[in-house]
């Protein structure tokens, strides 16, 4: 049965036409026919896939007896063994009955049994039309298995056939199902036909795809069956094994005998190509595909090629090949698609796309819409019909469009003549004004072509600067004349037409003829007119009525009427006009008259007096043409040479059209001008009141400018000279009369006020402060109101510093430069700039370091320099006596300049003086020595620098000198003898002079030496020696006894022995006295130096200028103590000098020695006290200077940062000064110790001899010494007391300085917060700019005054005034800047409301007090801080200056600041609301004011303000925008202005203080460099 079904499928799929070649798609005639690929086993060689295959792992299987391959033993399946594997490749390999191979699944022992299925999948690579599927089993066939297929590669699995003995149970399908005709034939059947267990081997299962399908015999017409047989993949699902039922015992041998095994898997069918291909093969991608014919494409030739869409695609059948036909696109496209509707209606379904050449239609057979072509072979062209002018956009075959009425053109793109503005409604008619247009309107825009002076779309109005639109005017409108001052004019109704006429009825009427040579003569006149002779080339000159102002003839005709012979042509006549330096010629522009050839005729020649006329030479602009007519000086007619006329030619009439005042007929060409400001008159020919000609007497053509009389008078409109009033003068009333002051530029009657100066002398006003300053004070006076004395004068005219004192000329003894400035003090008259080395209130003394007469008439005889010798003078004292010139010399130094030593002294050394020669009183002839070497003049035989020893070969040092030794040259060992005159003898010689031989010695024969006598003489010599020794012993005993000789042995008294050693002690006491006096003088010098240092401290503390009272009192007391000490020392020195010291004194200590010891102790204590006083005073001076500098800076009103910095610098200076004092004490201490050692040495030397004072003869001296000791003790106590006071004063000053430094702590915080206050300076920029302009004007006036007073002294005075004014302007600028800080202080720091309160209070406090720089961060804390700082400032200012404002005013101002601080809380809410809107503005302000903060104080204010003016203007525009912010700023500015008014009084006082301070600084700078300075 399976074989029968298989044969049926093959028969149905085979071609019906016998003999038709299935491989050819075209027959022998080239006609298409169906073609099919070969029928094949599609499974052969293709690799099938099995889900389960035995051998992995290897296993044993036991075939049933009777099965193929069954034997006695079981076999083994091993996938790794090529001989024993049974993989899926054996399904589709070559099948042989003899050598069978098979695929085998695992046995039941491995779980292969229902419901576990084993699947075999076969992929065909493309769609095949399957005829049958055959399976040959190596074992028994399965009890249940199924065949599935896929119609397309990505399609679902579809059931193909089910085989099962339990169809319903296993697959849910009935067994033995069949189909009726009309039912869906794509249904899988289930059958039990092949489900028996027998045969055990080699059973076949053949499935025919068309078996049981009713339409199988009509396969070509059944798409369902065609799709049913189509498959791309096949799947065999082996679901249940057939068993004998012995598997239930699970015997392994039994289970190993049940498994699936297939030896062959065959699929019969053809490659599906739908009848359009005869073969299949791999494509470029290696995939199996049909090689399509019949213009088809696709893997299965399932569609037509893109351009072969003329009919629908269809399978090729035996009856028809259904070849795809190409589309008909008329050669204008290569793309088309199949359109079923088009095919249904036309039989051709190919619809072309993307037709070229602007064609359209299914076959590109016609032009697109709005395109055309005149030849079907040509491309279509666009119609381009104008949409607005065409009835529709489609044109005919010629491209001509159908136009709307009033529209023309091939494309209906233009209007007909007389129409314009093509639109959807067609064209509109032109409405050009014929008087102003030249032709019809532009057909596109409708704009009319206007004449030169006409404008508008319709040419219906004159251009600006013209008027009187007239048809006969070639330019349309006439140009406005208005004397060049206006371009706006119109026709006036106040003038009528007027004709200037010459008809020659009564003669030539003033016309003259001029020949070529230039001579004038009356023309030839007859009743017919004036005879013209063209051959003579004469000119006719018009009379006066045609000349002059003929502006009203501009643009009007000048008509000449001639009487000419019949048939003659018009004469070539030229018209020449001259006037105002201009000239031009015109030719006639028209000809009129009857053309009667038989009679003489009248001919009119018309000339238009306008620049647009033809043949105008040279061409002139309209204004110049009218200017020529305004002053026409000559009008001449000239007949050019030409053909001789047939008869006489007469000029019968000349008519010039003009105008004159009247109403009818109106002369519309006369203008009335609309004059700009400053002009008046119908033609703007006059200057309006208050205006003048820019060029005096310039006439109506000159421009008018405003009178520059500053509202103080009127000016002549032609000359411009002002007639001034209101006490003003000048060409422009720009200054007040002498004796008046004010700002005449304000334009008010009371601008100039009488000067409040003596005798109403001249004055001026500072522009910003409005301060009146007198400029011509009486001789000897100066100042803003002449309130101070002029340079070189002194006094107090207004009694500002006491009783009024008139100004007197300073008396400086002729020792000042009369041309210098600041020679004397303006109040006291004390001279400040003394010359010729003079000083004093009136330069009546010589300066320190100079001597002579300061009042000498000749400068050479005045003060001369001391020129003290630097080595011999005392540098600490005054250089010299101011009268004698005697310098203060060091000890033992003399001469006026201390250039040499006293007699008896030598070796001049700096700081020490001269040393004593110390010439020996016995050995020297005098007590003087050489001033350089110190060599004394010795007595005979004496040598040594001090003549204190005998020369070699001399002895007997005495008052007479030394005597010669006269030692025997033969017997003496040397020329020098002993002090007793005995010589040193050679052996064998003896005697004082060694001039004899010893006893028992004799002189040799040669006389060279002494020879010993024989030995017998020795005994005698020994005995004589014994006797001599006893004599010597006796002699010694006699010398040791007191025999009334106080000085020595008798031989000394007799002059037999030296006397130097004996007499030397007689001079010890006088030498000690001199040394002691020298030390006393040194002590006196030290006291003087201390006094001078105290005086310098006194000056440094400004005790002469109301300095610190406590400090100055202590310094005065110290000076009194030093003065008393000096007096005591001088008294003691005088007593010591007057004492008579005896030649000898007691050897025991006396009371005098004790007093001397006490004096040394007192001197030491005095020296130490003086050192401490100097150190304390120096510290007091530094502390005072520091405090004074601090107070002075506060008085000047410097900012907190500068105050803090200065105080810190001063504190460092105090510490540096203390360190310097310690260094100075360390340097002075060795010198003091040296002095003390000297005093001690002197005391030790004199102590033995001072004991003589205990004798009765010394009682007066001892009494004096006791008094001196008592005074010294009192001096010590006084010095100790004042030392204590000085220490306390220094401690007090040190405490005050530390307290002052502690006051800077709030100023440090002020410095941090004051930087933000600089952001409040912008709103005063404009006012400051005006200030600078005023300052420049005033300085220019001062420079002018400088030219009037060329003397140097006057120049200096003017320069001082200019400096004062500049300083005031700068102060005023600072004031305005601070006012701006206050104005912006309410708006700028909006970023922080709490910080805003502090900054606002800081501005008020700084501008009010100039001393308290603390900020009001919070109202209460700021108030307490300001009060504390103000109280400290008040206490300090009372000691530093009498010009500080009263504390009551500061208290009121601080209360005002407190009230302002209270008002800040009310503004806090408004500030918070405005914060967001001003954030960007704050950034701009911060950048701007950062530059202001870094501004150099010496930079001109104008320069700085000009640099920032543009940024401030931009910010002002932003802040000036309307809104709530502007209103709030206005309120803040009003409040700031109120505060400004309250502070102005205090600022005025501060300005006065600054002025006084500047005067003091000027005095300070004028002092010589060696004068005392308190800075």
UniProtKB/Swiss-Prot annotation:
Residues 271-326, 327-382, 383-429, 430-479, 480-489, 673-706, 707-754, 755-809, 810-865, 866-916, 917-964, 965-1013 form the Laminin EGF-like domain. A motif (Cell attachment site) lies at residues 1059-1061. Its main location: secreted. Glycans are attached at residues 87, 119, 295, 328, 631, 837, 980, 1185. Residues 1378-1399 are annotated as: Disordered. Keywords: Basement membrane, Cell adhesion, Coiled coil, Disease variant, Disulfide bond, Extracellular matrix, Glycoprotein, Laminin EGF-like domain, Repeat, Secreted, Signal. Disulfide bonds join 271-280, 273-290, 292-301, 304-324, 327-336, 329-352, 355-364, 367-380, 383-395, 385-401, 403-412, 415-427, 430-441, 432-448, 450-459, 462-477, 707-715, 709-722, 724-733, 736-752, 755-763, 757-774, 777-786, 789-807, 810-824, 812-831, 834-843, 846-863, 866-880, 868-887, 889-898, 901-914, 917-929, 919-936, 938-947, 950-962, 965-977, 967-983, 985-994, 997-1010. GO terms for molecular function: structural molecule activity. InterPro entries: EGF-like_dom, Laminin/Netrin_ECM, Laminin_IV, Laminin_N, LE_dom, LMN_ATRN_NET-like_EGF. Residues 1014-1575 are annotated as: Domain II and I. Broadly expressed in: skin, heart, lung, and the reproductive tracts. Residues 1073-1134, 1201-1228, 1410-1492, 1523-1567 form a coiled coil. One of its GO terms (biological process) is cell adhesion. Residues 31-270 form the Laminin N-terminal domain. Gene3D superfamilies: Galactose-binding domain-like, Laminin. CDD domains: EGF_Lam (cd00055). Pfam families: EGF_laminin, EGF_LMN_ATRN, Laminin_B, Laminin_N. Laminin is a complex glycoprotein, consisting of three different polypeptide chains (alpha, beta, gamma), which are bound to each other by disulfide bonds into a cross-shaped molecule comprising one long and three short arms with globules at each end. Gamma-3 is a subunit of laminin-12 (laminin-213), laminin-14 (laminin-423) and laminin-15 (laminin-523). Binding to cells via a high affinity receptor, laminin is thought to mediate the attachment, migration and organization of cells into tissues during embryonic development by interacting with other extracellular matrix components. This is Laminin subunit gamma-3.
